[in-house]
Amino acid sequence: MNAEITRFFEVLESYEHLLHAETQAIAAKDIDLVEEILAKKDLCMADLLTSKENLGSDPREDAKINSLIDKVIELQQRNYSIFSSLVEDQRNKKSGKSINSSPNKYNKLRQTYLDMDKSRISNLWD
């Protein structure tokens, strides 16, 4: 692998590690940690996009990278699904309480997953 491909692979691996950390934070229902990891993921994604721009070819042509990309996308989708379920559970728990007690943090984090800006993994291959 040339230096640019190696760099891309390393950053992609970092993103994968963040996804695993995010999975654990979601499972622990540690919203502050999830929010912190989301910020780190955004920085890592920006680095990944920059690294991708420096490549002379499609990184998916490399079987090892292609496999990791698929894994990252799968992890991202799984985390989104699990987090959406968590938000829905919280919404259901809070439905009997006053409107003022609804958790804005959950909605904010859910919206982070729905945002369609350049920091989202779905836009990496567009």
Describe the residue ranges of each PLM region.
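A structural signal for well-ordered alpha-helices, especially hydrophobic packing surfaces
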Residues: 16-19, 23, 45-52, 73-83
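A structural signal for long alpha-helical coiled-coils and helix-turn connectors
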Residues: 23-27, 49, 56, 87, ...
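Short terminal interaction segments
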Residues: 64-126
